[in-house]
Amino acid sequence: MDLKNRTVLVTGAGVRLGQAIAVSLGQRGMKVALHYHQSMEGAKKTLDLMGGDIKQHGCFQADLRQVSKIELLIQHIEEKLGQIDVLINNAADFFPTPLGEVSESEWDHLISLNLKAPFFLSQLVGTSMLKQGQGKIVNIADVAAERPWPQFLPYCASKAGLVSLTKGLAKALAPAVQVNAVAPGTMLPPHQISSFSQDLAIEKSLLKKMGRPDDIARAVTYFLENDFVTGTILPVDGGRMLAS
């Protein structure tokens, strides 16, 4: 796919991986819809980092845990930027949930944001892509889908579901729409992870270092520019899955 002047929706574009992906795609000439929930300042910073003509981009707020808000989000994006050609399901939450202490609200929150939202976004946008005759969907999964962490079981379950969803969507939307996923390993660490856990994750990788958000952005771009790949889960983890 030629990315120039295509419209892409990046969910969770105000921080970390989403910000890096959005900036990378904006610099490649795409019209970027920057979704955020609470990180309005982060979304504005992403817009500034993209440079160029910021009028061809836009920031859009939505709580993706609610399907009605997803529907409004898509409507607003299409009104401003046109039909969505590319969907990047990046928005997610991540925090410790030790077994025996997990509340129903924590479970519902993680599953709703990390799995339910990508499904309904993909259903809405994917059916529109089918009518257009082409499109790309890239989900941001996690190597924890295959190597679950005991202290983060609901999160790991949500990402395992996203991996399955990726493969199912690739079948359901073929041949017009390609659906793939990037599975990051240890990136720049969120504040919830201890320095000990960071060091342990690095030690378990073959490359003995953490990845950077730009590593994920480049993997996403690979999927968008390649028209003969679908249903693939690409680990970007410094070889951690092989080393485990």
Where are these regions (language model features)?
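Conserved glycine-rich cofactor-binding loop
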Residues: 7, 14-15
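Conserved Rossmann-fold SDR core element
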Residues: 25, 83, 163, 173-187, ...
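Substrate-binding pocket helix/loop in short-chain dehydrogenase/reductase
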Residues: 98-99, 106-111, 137, 201
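Active-site loop-to-helix junction immediately N-terminal to the catalytic Tyr of the SDR YXXXK motif
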Residues: 102, 144, 148-156, 168
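Active-site helix of classical SDR
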Residues: 122, 158, 166
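Alpha-helical segment proximal to the catalytic Tyr-Lys
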Residues: 127, 170-175
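C-terminal substrate-recognition "lid" of short-chain dehydrogenase/reductases
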Residues: 134, 212-236, 241
